[in-house]
From Swiss-Prot:
Positions with biased composition (Polar residues): 1-10
Keyword Transmembrane annotated: yes
Family: Belongs to the major facilitator superfamily.
Expression induction: Expression is induced under iron-depleted conditions.
Membrane topology recorded in Swiss-Prot or TrEMBL: Multi-pass membrane protein
Name of the protein in question: MFS siderochrome iron transporter 1
Biased composition (Basic and acidic residues): 11-29
Keywords assigned: Glycoprotein, Membrane, Transmembrane, Transmembrane helix, Transport
Subcellular locations according to the entry: Membrane
Annotated GO CC locations: membrane
Sugar-modified residues: 209, 487
Length: 521
C-alpha cells in the first residue's frame, strides 16, 4: 500500500508543471557568454533548450540517433567508394586516376554549399530527406556506366547529395538532443566507421573475384563487373536508408530553427509533439516564450521591430554569416574551425582517397599486391575504426580532456601513425601502422564533427557547418590535383598528410569554447 502511494506521488510529481520547471535549475549552463548572441534569440533558445532537457533523451531522440547516423554512413561510404573502385576502373577505362576523386570532390563541394546554407533558409527537413535520395539514385546509376566521363559525371552528382549529409544531419541531431546528451554527437561517428566496414566487406569479394587482374593489358566490361556490382549494392542500400528516413521516421522541423525565424507557436507545437512521442509532458508555453522575449528585448522599439523582421525572413541574407562573427571570441572560434576543417580535409583526402591504391602499390613492392590481399587489409583497417567512436564519446566528457584535448591528442597520434607507415618494410607492418591510423583518425573525426556544430548558434548552425564543410571540400579538391603531379609510389603524400594533421592538433588547443558540460544554443 505504501509502495503504491509512493509511486502515485512520484507520477504526479513527474507530470506537475511546477515540478518540471524546477528541473530546469539543473540544466547545463549555456555555452555562449552573455552578449554573444542576439538577446531575444538567446533568451528563447535557452528556454527551448530547457524544455528539451526536461523532456529528456527518449524514443524520438534515439530514433533520430539511428536515422541521422545514416548520414554519417553515407558520408563514409561514397567518398571511400572512389578509392575502392579506383584500381579496377583505371584498368578498364585507362584514365589518370586522380580525376575520379576530383569529380567526386567537386560534387561534395557543391553539395556542402547548397544543403548546409539552405537548411538555415528553408529549414532542416527537406535537406535531411533529399540528400540520401540523390546519393542513392545516382550511385545506383553509376554502376551502369560505359565510360569514364559518364562515371565521373554521375559521381559528381552523388557527391552533391552526400555533401549535404554531415552539415545538415549534425545540426538536426544537436537541435533535438538534450544538452546533457550532446556527447552522443561524437558517438554518432560509429556510423561512419560502420560505413567504412560495410563498404570494405562488400568490396572485398566483389572486387577480388570479378575484376581483371592488376596490371592486365586488356580489361573488358565482362571481365570487370566487380566495381559495378559494388555500386549497385551500395546504391540500393543508400536508397533503402532514405526510404526508412522518409517513410518510417517522422522528422519534425527543428524548434530552434523555428524560434530563430520568429515562428514561436510552431516551435511550441513541435516541443509538445516530441514530449507526447516520448511519453513525457512539457511545461513550456507560448506565453513563457513571449515573456522572456519581452524581458530580453531592447527598449528601443525600432530595434525590436527590426529584429523581428530579420527573424521572420526566409530569404538568404548575410545575417547567418554575420552571426558567426558577432563577437571577437565567436569570430576567432569560427575562423579557427574553418582552418581546422580545411587542413584536415586536405590531409585526409590526400591519404584516404588513394589508400587502397597505395596499399596495392606498396604491396607490389612486398610481393603481395593482389586484390584479395589489398581489400582484406582494407577490411581489417575499417574494423579498427569502430571502437574509436566509443572511446571518443567517453574521452570528450572527461574533465581534463573535453572536446579540445581529445581532438588535439587524437590528431597528433593520427599524424604520428601516418609517419610510421613510411617505415614499413613488409605488408603486415604497413597494415599494422594503418590500423593505428584508422583507430585514431576515427576519434579525431568523431570529435571534429561534434565540436563544430556545438559551438555554432542553432539559428546559424547550418551556415557554420556549411562554411567548415566548404573549407574541407575546397581543400579536398586540391588533394587529387596534388596527386596528379605527385608520385603515389613514394612516401611524399604521406609526409604531407602527417605533418598537416599534427599541425591541426596543435591548433585545436587554441579553440576558445569548450562545450563539455555546457548546452549549445
Amino acid at each position: 500500500m505504501d509502495k503504491t502511494a509512493s509511486l502515485t506521488s512520484q507520477d504526479a510529481e513527474k507530470h506537475d508543471p511546477d515540478a518540471l520547471r524546477k528541473e530546469r535549475a539543473t540544466d547545463p549552463p549555456d555555452l555562449f557568454e552573455h552578449g554573444a548572441l542576439d538577446p531575444v534569440y538567446q533568451a528563447k533558445a535557452h528556454l527551448i533548450a530547457s524544455a528539451i532537457q526536461e523532456i529528456g533523451m527518449g524514443k524520438y531522440q534515439w530514433g533520430l540517433f539511428v536515422v541521422a547516423g545514416f548520414g554519417w554512413f553515407s558520408d563514409s561510404v561514397w567518398p571511400l567508394m572512389g578509392s575502392l573502385i579506383l584500381s579496377p576502373v583505371v584498368n578498364e577505362f585507362q584514365f589518370n586516376s586522380p580525376f575520379l576523386s576530383l569529380a567526386l570532390n567537386a560534387g561534395l563541394l557543391a553539395g556542402a554549399i547548397f544543403w548546409a546554407f539552405g537548411c538555415d533558409i528553408w529549414g532542416r527537413r527537406w535537406s535531411f530527406n533529399l540528400s540520401l535520395l540523390i546519393a542513392g539514385a545516382f550511385g545506383l546509376a553509376a554502376g551502369g556506366t560505359q565510360n569514364f566521363v559518364a562515371l565521373a559525371c554521375l559521381f559528381a552528382v552523388v557527391g552533391f547529395g552526400v555533401g549535404g549529409n554531415m552539415p545538415v544531419d549534425s545540426a538536426v541531431f544537436l537541435d533535438f538532443v538534450p544538452g546533457s546528451y550532446q556527447y552522443l554527437l561524437t558517438i554518432l561517428s560509429i556510423w561512419w566507421s560502420i560505413g567504412q566496414l560495410v563498404a570494405s566487406l562488400i568490396a572485398w569479394p566483389l572486387i577480388a573475384n570479378f575484376s581483371c587482374p592488376i596490371g592486365s593489358t586488356t580489361c573488358t566490361r565482362a571481365d570487370n563487373m566487380g566495381w559495378r556490382y559494388l555500386l549497385f549494392t551500395l546504391g540500393g542500400m543508400t536508397l533503402l536508408l532514405w526510404a526508412i528516413r522518409f517513410f518510417v521516421f517522422p522528422l519534425m522541423e527543428s524548434p530552434r530553427f523555428l524560434v530563430g525565424r520568429g515562428r514561436d507557436a510552431e516551435a511550441i507545437a513541435v516541443i509538445q509533439r516530441i514530449a507526447q512521442f516520448n511519453g513525457r509532458p512539457s511545461s513550456l508555453t507560448l506565453e513563457e516564450l513571449a515573456m522572456v522575449a519581452e524581458k530580453a528585448a531592447p527598449k528601443d522599439a525600432v530595434a525590436t521591430q527590426r529584429r523581428q523582421v530579420l527573424s521572420q525572413s526566409s530569404d538568404f541574407s548575410t545575417d547567418h554569416v554575420k552571426g558567426l562573427f558577432a563577437t571577437p571570441k565567436l569570430a576567432w572560434s569560427t575562423s579557427l574551425l574553418i582552418a581546422l576543417w580545411g587542413i584536415i580535409g586536405l590531409a585526409s583526402t590526400l591519404y584516404n582517397s588513394f589508400l587502397p591504391f597505395l596499399l596495392a602499390n606498396r604491396g607490389a613492392e612486398f610481393g603481395d599486391s593482389s586484390y584479395f590481399i589489398t581489400y582484406r587489409n582494407q577490411v581489417i583497417i575499417a574494423v579498427l575504426g569502430v571502437p574509436g567512436a566509443f572511446l571518443a564519446g567517453w574521452a570528450v566528457e572527461q574533465p581534463y580532456l573535453g572536446r579540445k584535448g581529445t581532438l588535439a591528442i587524437s590528431a597528433g597520434l593520427t599524424g604520428v601513425f601516418l609517419f610510421a607507415t613510411t617505415t614499413a618494410r613488409s605488408s603486415n607492418a604497413l597494415l599494422g601502422w594503418n590500423c593505428g591510423y584508422a583507430f585514431h583518425s576515427n576519434i579525431m573525426y568523431g570529435v571534429l564533427y561534434a565540436i563544430s556544430p556545438e559551438v555554432f548558434p542553432a539559428k546559424d548552425r547550418g551556415t557554420g557547418n556549411g562554411l567548415t564543410a566548404t573549407a574541407t571540400r575546397v581543400f579536398g579538391l586540391i588533394a587529387p590535383v596534388i596527386a596528379l603531379y605527385a608520385n603515389l609510389s613514394t612516401a611524399v603524400p604521406v609526409y604531407v598528410s602527417g605533418a598537416l594533421i599534427i599541425a591541426s592538433g596543435a591548433m585545436a588547443l587554441l579553440l576558445p569554447y569548450e562545450p563539455r558540460g555546457r548546452a549549445s544554443l
